[in-house]
Amino acid sequence: MVNPKSELFEQHPDWAIHDENREIYYYRNQLVLDLSNPKVQDYVYSVIENLMKENPDIAFFKWDCNSPITNIYSPYLKNKQGNMYIDHIRGIYNVMKRVNKNYPDVPMMLCSGGGARCDYEALKYFTEFWCSDNTDPIERIYIQWGFSQFFPAKAMCAHVTSWNKNTSVKFRTDVASMCKLGFDIGLKDMSAEELEYCQTAVSNWKRLNPAIMDGDQYRLVSPYESNHMA
């Protein structure tokens, strides 16, 4: 993403996906960088590389595709506009190949507010997908059931959040523990008992990690056919 009032856009307006001859639509006051352009790929990689050089202890990256592509025109592709979507995604993968090669031990989540950017090629470069911004544990049961039809549990990032406080922290944690467990919740708002339970749950998840992440999966009870699932 690039802000039209940024130094980057002022210096390289042709690096953004847009057609100067048409009214430009801004999503979150931004445009999408044209990753079909090798120069843009080099720039994006350099940003990550500089971050790692300046902060070698970075332990995690979240790559968030926070905008649909709206202004459908690539200044770089010129008369090959039919290639734009494909070449743009290939450009993302070219960047990720370099990141993965040079920083293989840094896990990376691919996010799009949901599963819109999840595919098998991306599994080569990202350690996990953010399945949905909907973290209601009841609805996540259906999301994770469906997502697991196509991707393994280790590819699904599942976080305990404050969404749907009508459910217990235990229930929220149990649902998230089916996948790659994480927490996006204010610890100061949790009781001592809840904190103690979560600490125990994390220890158990780590102990059971080989089975959860790499074990064989058997579908026993569908949430679509019952009020529980297994």
What are the language-model segments listed below?
Residues E7-K170, D174, K180-E196:
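Active-site neighborhood of glycoside hydrolase catalytic domains
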